[in-house]
Amino acid sequence: MRRLSLWWLLSRVCLLLPPPCALVLAGVPSSSSHPQPCQILKRIGHAVRVGAVHLQPWTTAPRAASRAQEGGRAGAQRDDPESGTWRPPAPSQGARWLGSALHGRGPPGSRKLGEGAGAETLWPRDALLFAVENLNRVEGLLPYNLSLEVVMAIEAGLGDLPLMPFSSPSSPWSSDPFSFLQSVCHTVVVQGVSALLAFPQSQGEMMELDLVSSVLHIPVLSIVRHEFPRESQNPLHLQLSLENSLSSDADVTVSILTMNNWYNFSLLLCQEDWNITDFLLLTENNSKFHLESVINITANLSSTKDLLSFLQVQMDNIRNSTPTMVMFGCDMDSIRQIFEMSTQFGLSPPELHWVLGDSQNVEELRTEGLPLGLIAHGKTTQSVFEYYVQDAMELVARAVATATMIQPELALLPSTMNCMDVKTTNLTSGQYLSRFLANTTFRGLSGSIKVKGSTIISSENNFFIWNLQHDPMGKPMWTRLGSWQGGRIVMDSGIWPEQAQRHKTHFQHPNKLHLRVVTLIEHPFVFTREVDDEGLCPAGQLCLDPMTNDSSMLDRLFSSLHSSNDTVPIKFKKCCYGYCIDLLEQLAEDMNFDFDLYIVGDGKYGAWKNGHWTGLVGDLLSGTANMAVTSFSINTARSQVIDFTSPFFSTSLGILVRTRDTAAPIGAFMWPLHWTMWLGIFVALHITAIFLTLYEWKSPFGMTPKGRNRNKVFSFSSALNVCYALLFGRTAAIKPPKCWTGRFLMNLWAIFCMFCLSTYTANLAAVMVGEKIYEELSGIHDPKLHHPSQGFRFGTVRESSAEDYVRQSFPEMHEYMRRYNVPATPDGVQYLKNDPEKLDAFIMDKALLDYEVSIDADCKLLTVGKPFAIEGYGIGLPPNSPLTSNISELISQYKSHGFMDVLHDKWYKVVPCGKRSFAVTETLQMGIKHFSGLFVLLCIGFGLSILTTIGEHIVHRLLLPRIKNKSKLQYWLHTSQRFHRALNTSFVEEKQPRSKTKRVEKSRWRRWTCKTEGDSELSLFPRSNLGPQQLMVWNTSNLSHDNQRKYIFNDEEGQNQLGTQAHQDIPLPQRRRELPASLTTNGKADSLNVTRSSVIQELSELEKQIQVIRQELQLAVSRKTELEEYQKTNRTCES
């Protein structure tokens, strides 16, 4: 107990001493391993609460036009003025970005503070909520798994319901300091807050906050637009100013001049009212600096001619006296214009050193029109309002965390929760916490956070210094020379312009650290390709693949490689490139070291085997390699023997399977459309056929017996024939409807069929290939892995982190899968893709599996299940390597600056397999297995046709006789014309007109022959050749050609002559083509009980036939008389 009391006393004393004493507390047992104060955590609800007051929105004023930039911050959801209640804000662009703000990436579209073409509204409530959300995701920020909560004051000015009788919406709730104090007590303090965050906008509000902190003994952090002067130095009231101090630019510029010994300088001002007071004070206080002249071109910028003449005069005056020119208040367009004119007078570097005194936006720096050697400074990211709010909240959290490890009760339990009963103890919780606030420093989003004096929180941004130089290809590029940190310049690798100028004749490269780096081929982190004919690498890094880890052998190979007489066999040389090679090159550039690269001899990551470490770990431990750069997983076993940097890539383990195309089933041709669609199509088809039939039979112009003397009838079977022909697009002869309504409906049905058929055709190819199936695994805990059935094979890479994880977590599973493990990742992928496959599942790092899936041209690979065993890739180093911390710090910078994101996009932005599916469908060939269902359907159709034929015979022999006996079922013309004829026609009725036709033919085909003297012969031909159908009742042919007669007679000289005499017959009535006796002109059949109308019609037809026969008889008798007279005349002549 006495020992603990001494340590407690030492900790209390250190609180009163400067910050270095805080380091002593790191070794205090009671501070480093304090037991969890369960009762205290229960009382505070496992949360640290921070109050918030003065939450009225801010409206920022625009800056000068020359510094204005476009941008905008998405507004959050406002409070509802009608309901009087506050609602949580909707996520905005800044909100969504703040989730990644801890990694240093700027929010897309966020406007920088103090910039913008116009006024901008800032919402403290939104910033507080998002700050709490982000900080609660940071692991280890608060001890004992505590979380941050924000308690916001109720303010009538924002539409909240006033809770106090002294506050009203018509007047500001903080107009009276005492009322403000009471309001804070009743709405914020009573909930037990450790500190208050405020957003005052006036000096009066600052005084109110001074009063609150003094009376309630609660730390108050005020975030202000600009620093307010204060008479009292209240350590409980701190203020953080958002306004960037101009002295920072002045300090950086002066340090640049001092480092290069550029003490004689001149100033060039593009804006006369630009504030350079701080810069002038710093140079005047240093006796080494001498200001030659000040060139003010503000009045001449508008006219190029005036600017040219003015610069010519001024440059002539300083040509020989001033080696350095510092520019202030110039935008990039003005700078380019000035440099173009200066070049005409020969004043470009190195004759004149140009320095930009104002902080520049690094993203806007360009190289066009700027001279080599130009020096600029600026920040890679600009601070936004949310940065400062989150940094203030993080300052409180860090102070509470540090204080909790010393005295948890005093740090976590607020002393003031009732304003009416303020405790007057010697040390309140607020006073205790304020001491830690003053001694807390950290690197925040807005800059380096620390407390200056006792009341000012400073946020110093790190400036980077850039120089325009030539890249290795000879092109101009901005090169980083160093950074401004903690009030001084920290140089990076490289050489400053003045140093290069002094040593350009006898410059010697400094000695660089030379490292031997081992790697392992793993796509996309490391690729290899063959070298060219000369043994060099046009792209990538030259590496050796000696297939050994013998250190002496590697020494000889690299020694020969660097000698003038290179004798390394060409088979050992490779060109290495990829994600990790780019990272290695960047590290070498930033840390100023050279390296030799080789591929690990055994191709293993490293595992403890046969009493020693293999692979990459073995090379690091044996001293063969100084660094291992590849997809090197950080696990417990490796971390115990070698050093790892902070992870540069986060991943997990995953499971890779192969998809298989199943054979298309018999009914696959039906799959393009759902069964409900097929049902709907055929229902709509028959409904359409019914309506087509109804429209045709109800129309006066339809193809029906009541129509306009139609020779055909449109029945329901005709409608079905039309609908099916349009649906399947067959070009068979159809009987289209004649009425307008029917044709319109038929065209609508054609449009419907066109869209259905197009949809079916578009989906047919994708469906015909069959469904893709794969092994469905839920993850590492899937029963198929723990209890594999016979024939299920899965494995991983030997001596990898995946195998180590399975060995430690699931020994039985590891024992089963050992027989299926493969040497490398490509082997496992190939085993999956083989036909037949040698593996059913492959377990490996998901980062590697995702890449294999993305480059799979056959689209057969797929990752399944939930990821497991979260891990990271790090750079391996020998134990206790001095490079570990430096490389880890650079990797953290690469993450915050977005360099790692660039690498990820470069090597992982591959076209996904899903978007390349068109390349597969273009060459898709379908075999008979894909159309087996259609052949089956055709065979079924043949069988149904045979059954239909049998059915026709059954109907004809059995059903028709029965229906004929029923007089009510004789009319079927609207349904089927053939069925109707079959019911209404008999054999006897068809036989009578046939016999009659034959008798008429015989009577019409007659021939008379008369022989005269001289063996003459008179032949009488019939007037026409009438076919067998021309004497039928319904014959419609005319007999106009039956009016010519041929005669053979002798002239008066007794010579036989042939003559033709035209004889006009008596016109015959028009006759129609005869149809079967049981049919009328429009195809209607007579019933057995003939109606009166049909009898009259038949009598009229018979009368016409009799008239025709009578006329023919008269003609025959007349002709007979003529012939008889002619015969008598001849006889008289002979006598």
Swiss-Prot record:
Disulfide bonds join 537-575, 543-576, 859-913. Keywords: Calcium, Cell membrane, Coiled coil, Disulfide bond, Glycoprotein, Ion channel, Ion transport, Ligand-gated ion channel, Magnesium, Membrane, Postsynaptic cell membrane, Receptor, Signal, Synapse, Transmembrane, Transmembrane helix, Transport. Residues 951-987 are annotated as: PPP2CB binding site. Glycans are attached at residues 145, 264, 275, 285, 296, 300, 426, 439, 549, 565, 886. It is a multi-pass membrane protein. Residues 1-23 form the signal peptide. The keyword Transmembrane applies. This is Glutamate receptor ionotropic, NMDA 3A. The lineage of its organism: Eukaryota, Metazoa, Chordata, Craniata, Vertebrata. The gene is Grin3a.
